Swiss-Prot record:
This protein's name: D-alanyl carrier protein
PTM annotation, UniProt: 4'-phosphopantetheine is transferred from CoA to a specific serine of apo-DCP.
Gene Ontology cellular component terms for the protein in this record: cytoplasm
Modified residues (O-(pantetheine 4'-phosphoryl)serine): S35
Chain ranges of the Carrier domain: 1-77
HAMAP family found in the cross-reference section: DltC
Subcellular localization: Cytoplasm
One example GO MF annotation: D-alanyl carrier activity
Its job: Carrier protein involved in the D-alanylation of lipoteichoic acid (LTA). The loading of thioester-linked D-alanine onto DltC is catalyzed by D-alanine--D-alanyl carrier protein ligase DltA. The DltC-carried D-alanyl group is further transferred to cell membrane phosphatidylglycerol (PG) by forming an ester bond, probably catalyzed by DltD. D-alanylation of LTA plays an important role in modulating the properties of the cell wall in Gram-positive bacteria, influencing the net charge of the cell wall.
UniProtKB keywords: Cell wall biogenesis/degradation, Cytoplasm, Phosphopantetheine, Phosphoprotein
Disulfide bonds: none
Pathway: Cell wall biogenesis; lipoteichoic acid biosynthesis
Main subcellular location: cytoplasm
Protein encoded by which gene: dltC
Amino acid sequence: MDIKSEVIEIIDELFMEDVSDMMDEDLFDAGVLDSMGTVELIVEIENRFDIRVPVTEFGRDDWNTANKIIAGIVELQNA
């Protein structure tokens, strides 16, 4: 499974929201993510992709859309 599909699946599993048609929509403004959901999302991303997401790397503006989450994962995998 590619990163995009996996991120969509993670968000759907955690928040019961299909974001495949809203890849650039702000997930906080859309009510998909909140502070607690962000923690759940980070933990799941770390487990599934075997990466560590430093708190300093996870700013709301940097990871607020599905596409930005995907880009962040790719960046951390290549670090």
